[in-house]
Amino acid sequence: MGRNPRIQFAGALYHVTTRGNAKQRVCLDDWDFAWLVAQIGEVVTRYSWVCQSYCLLGNHFHVSVATPEPNLAKGMRILNGSYAQRFNRRYGRVGHVFQGRYGAELIRRHEHLLEVGRYIALNPVRAGLCSRPELWPWSSYRATIGLDEPPPWLAIDDLLAPFSGGPTPAAVRYRAFVEDGLHALRAGSRSAGSGDLVPGHGRGHGPRTRPRTWSAGSATSG
């Protein structure tokens, strides 16, 4: 039976997940992590994607991207393929590095992009790798809240814009929004980004305006 085709269209917004084959690690040291981040940036730039967030863990990674052209499959094939070749060459391995195809969830709702961004930021905490999301170095979260310089291909404004317009800086309000998710995670919430904490609710750290939306054929404000 053939594989179901990916849903691709101009302006689509995705939460993409790629996992190591048989749950094996795909980043064994800092050099691997840094090289994978660089590869993500190269593919984002090459295919004119808009990347709002990413997080790399030992055996998988997450990215959220908008694709002004219907080219997610092409870009992910280059990203995963080039990294797998380098990984196998570096460690003298053969065979698959990643487990089957990547996962791609369409982000359809306005508030879902913020929920996905928070979910991605909290992944290292959820995995027990650190106690707070800003302590994990292989994530875009530190750049989004102003602790690191963002790379030119990272669209942090797409997550910060909904929190702008008040006396408190947008990065501070976005950090508080993620903190809400961290509190829920520690309290045993079933998922910090599954809708338990919808932007605009909880402890008052939600956005003042609606996040940017992505329409077919372009990436425009909605």
Whereabouts are the PLM-identified features?
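Conserved metal-phosphate-binding beta-hairpin within the catalytic cores
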Residues: 63
